[in-house]
């Protein structure tokens, strides 16, 4: 083994971190913290459309994700929403692109190397539309547990998130086996809950049916959407029609992991957990309260 091979594990991370810091300083993005993002939602009653690495892969490249294959129409819409100028829609980017304090080592490393490959491309895309200096929300408000060193962050964020639907009627648009809020108290302070069940995979392929169903069943409720990349587009379209819609992503699973003090991304019984090994059969949910909330099923 030569000296280069010996020093490489030390040298490469140092150089990568230095380049990452240089990117952030030279082309900074204005991204609110998780708590400031929630305060903004509470004050302005706006909708949110979130972008993580999966949405970026579809929007900026010809890639798909685990539960949504690449779709050129979805890619086009994700590009459009990313550049939205609708004041009723808060576009959200990962706060880790601005500040990594408090994140665990795995999350820091992931977003550092992601940024080395994609940050300049993202900034260039935003700048072309004059959006580089726009203020963005934090896409990680629905993922406050697994990427963080301390559980206190998740406890604060979830406590504030619950204020958004305090005593409000909710319409959930979710994958068939997502079961948002079932078996825990995440939504226990809501006044009422209705559910539209959608395909667990490739939901965007049924997008028009989903959009029509929401229009049919909406009666002033706050809309919570857990539907992969399709949720980003749906939240934007609903905001354009005067509805408040929140793309909540993995919020329920993160809440379950927090309650369990999970150290790994474990399977949650009775719920589809795409980031864990889904070898177990999820099965049907016989909870009568959950079944009574379902107003529509749009399945593959």
What is each model feature region?
Residues 176-220:
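A mid-sequence, solvent-exposed acidic-amphipathic segment
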Residues 226-228:
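Glycine-rich beta-strand-to-loop/alpha-helix junction loops that act as flexible
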Residues 48, 172, 192-195, 245:
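Conserved beta-strand scaffold positions in the cores of enzyme catalytic domains, especially
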Residues 2-187, 299:
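Electropositive, gly/pro-rich neighborhoods at or near active sites that engage anionic ligands
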Residues 230-300:
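C-terminal functional extensions of proteins
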Residues 52, 95, 197-199, 249:
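Residues at the C-termini of beta-strands that transition into short coil/loop
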Residues 169, 221-222:
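Structural motif
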């Amino acid at each position: 083994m030569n000296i280069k091979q010996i020093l490489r594990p030390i040298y490469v991370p140092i150089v990568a971190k230095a380049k990452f810091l240089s990117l952030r300083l030279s082309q900074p993005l204005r991204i609110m913290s998780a708590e400031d993002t929630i305060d903004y939602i509470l004050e302005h009653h706006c909708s949110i459309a979130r972008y993580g690495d999966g949405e970026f892969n579809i929007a900026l490249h010809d890639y798909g994700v685990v539960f949504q294959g690449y779709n050129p129409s979805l890619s086009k819409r994700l590009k459009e929403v990313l550049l939205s100028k609708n004041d009723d829609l808060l576009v959200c980017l990962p706060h880790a692109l601005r500040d990594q304090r408090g994140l665990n080592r795995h999350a820091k490393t992931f977003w550092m190397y992601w940024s080395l490959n994609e940050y300049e491309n993202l900034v260039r895309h935003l700048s072309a539309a004059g959006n580089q200096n726009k203020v963005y929300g934090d896409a990680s408000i629905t993922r406050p547990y697994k990427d963080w060193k301390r559980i206190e962050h998740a406890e604060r964020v979830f406590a504030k998130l619950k204020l958004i639907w305090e005593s409000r009627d909710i319409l959930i648009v979710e994958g068939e086996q997502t079961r948002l809020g079932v078996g825990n108290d995440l939504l226990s302070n809501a006044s009422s809950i209705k559910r539209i069940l959608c395909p667990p995979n490739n939901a965007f392929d049924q997008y028009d049916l989903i959009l029509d169903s929401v229009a049919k069943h909406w009666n002033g409720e706050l809309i919570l959407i857990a539907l992969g990349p399709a949720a980003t587009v749906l939240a934007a379209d609903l905001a354009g029609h005067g509805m408040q819609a929140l793309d909540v992503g993995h919020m329920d699973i993160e809440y379950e992991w927090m309650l369990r003090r999970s150290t790994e991304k474990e399977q949650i019984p009775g719920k589809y957990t795409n980031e864990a090994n889904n070898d177990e059969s999820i099965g049907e949910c016989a909870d009568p309260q959950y079944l009574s909330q379902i107003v529509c099923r749009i399945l593959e």
